[in-house]
A protein has these predicted regions:
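Short glycine-rich, low-complexity segments
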Residues: 1-48, 68-100
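Short beta-strand-centered aromatic/proline hotspots
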Residues: 49-56
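Residue-level signal for tight coil/turn positions that link beta-strands
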Residues: 58-59, 82
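Short aromatic-glycine-enriched beta-strand elements
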Residues: 60-65
Length: 100
């Protein structure tokens, strides 16, 4: 197993999402993907939580590169169907790079 250190930077979400309350979830996810913003999901069907960055995006699903919240290292990749997301938390943190 390799441990990857994740370099992050605090960001101002209002600059990226000036009117987030009027945006569709797909628009929010796309901006998170484009800007490598950390996200936190809760699944309605599986009652599970996932935390990480979006590696791939389309209008129906995303591929999430999961980060362990305790250790801060990548642990898995998950496919998430957008309509199954019950809660989406957008963090004010952007991933700048990953040291290998």
């Amino acid at each position: 197993d390799r441990i990857n250190l994740i370099e992050t930077k605090d960001i101002n979400l209002e600059e990226i999402f000036p009117n987030i309350v009027k945006m569709k979830i797909e628009e929010v996810l796309k901006k998170c993907f484009e800007n490598k913003i950390l996200v936190h999901f809760e699944h309605e069907k599986s009652y599970s939580e996932k935390f990480g960055i979006i590696e791939r995006f389309d209008n129906e699903k995303i591929i999430l590169k999961e980060i362990d919240k305790m250790t801060g290292i990548f642990i898995a990749k998950s496919e998430i169907i957008i309509e199954d997301i019950s809660f989406l938390f957008v963090r004010n943190c952007k991933v700048l790079g990953i040291e290998r």
